[in-house]
């Protein structure tokens, strides 16, 4: 086994460790709230009349996830199943739904809205533990014994079945679009070194009225997850002056940076970063063009240099795009 393959194996362990922690923390987040309510997770009923848009979304996503996971299991695609469930738990359950509902579930007053959010999260997590059990049997049983005290072991339960009545493809598509906008806002923050604490305004220029309505339905969620102070949506909206832009499904995102950044200083910073990255890339290219180095150095060392070069080329491309936007 080479040094590179050993490193890749270590990385896999770290990924699974981090995922296990993420799942554990999601269950730990809910548990004290259940204690406060004096209820077991399995006892909480869901009230459909109180479903918010994000509740309908996560419940629909869960049903489609159950259907896809069932197919993968029946076809013995265990690696595909593990990766698929990883993304659902990490991205949809933890990074999206939990972030949206955190304030509601953490509130001191036990309102009907809080009870319903807890019931939905309990239902989602119970199904998550069932779905993950074939690939993570030990931690799923442990979490089940804590969160669903008194219920049967996961291994004894029937495999989850999708509830077709909860599937809403339109809502799932709307949220896919909303999360693409959120990721684009975060990408702009990263490109221009804008702190997550800094409130930004944004304009989403869409191609048609249907897309406009879809984005507007999710405006509150986009604003909250992106750290925006203001969000406007319009068909063929004009690009504001001194704005960063990003392509999103069905349109384009504009983020005005006037008042956030000093135009001249930011252009100078980007030019300096590009110059620095180009110089570094040139030195790496020179090293990699030396056949004596490539053939004589350990494979891991050569691969590390190639990775460094790819990183510098990525920095150059991103900064050149950012520079083009500001000019």
Name each model-derived stretch.
Residues 2-327:
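Feature 926 captures the class I aminoacyl-tRNA synthetase adenylation module centered on the KMSKS loop
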């Amino acid at each position: 086994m080479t040094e590179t393959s050993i490193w890749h194996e270590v990385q896999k362990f770290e990924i699974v460790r981090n995922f296990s922690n993420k799942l554990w923390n999601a269950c730990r987040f809910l548990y004290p709230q259940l204690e406060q309510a004096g209820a077991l997770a399995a006892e909480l009923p869901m009230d459909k009349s109180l479903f918010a848009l994000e509740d309908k979304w996560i419940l629909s996503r869960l049903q489609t996830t159950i259907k896809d996971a069932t197919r993968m299991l029946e076809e013995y695609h265990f690696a595909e199943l593990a990766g698929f469930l990883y993304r659902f738990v990490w991205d949809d359950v933890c990074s999206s739904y939990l972030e949206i509902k955190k304030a509601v579930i953490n509130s001191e007053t036990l309102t009907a809205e809080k009870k319903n959010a807890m019931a939905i999260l309990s239902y989602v997590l119970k199904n998550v533990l069932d779905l993950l059990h074939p690939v993570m049997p030990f931690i799923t049983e442990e979490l089940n014994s804590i969160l669903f005290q008194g219920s049967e072991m996961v291994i004894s339960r029937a495999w989850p079945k999708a509830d077709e009545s909860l599937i809403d493809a339109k809502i799932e598509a709307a949220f896919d679009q909303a999360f693409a906008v959120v990721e684009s806002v975060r990408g702009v923050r990263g490109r221009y070194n804008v702190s997550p604490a800094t409130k930004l305004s944004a304009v989403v220029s869409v191609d048609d009225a249907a897309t406009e309505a879809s984005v507007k339905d999710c405006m509150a969620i986009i604003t909250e997850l992106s750290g925006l102070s203001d969000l406007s949506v319009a068909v063929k909206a004009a690009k504001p002056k001194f704005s960063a832009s990003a392509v999103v499904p069905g349109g384009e995102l504009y983020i005005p940076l006037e008042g956030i950044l000093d135009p001249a200083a930011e252009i100078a910073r980007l030019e300096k970063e590009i110059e620095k990255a180009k110089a570094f890339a040139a030195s790496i290219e020179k090293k990699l063009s030396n056949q004596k180095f490539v053939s004589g150095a350990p494979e891991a060392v050569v691969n590390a240099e190639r990775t460094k070069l790819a990183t510098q080329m990525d920095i150059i491309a991103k900064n050149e795009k950012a520079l083009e936007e500001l000019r």
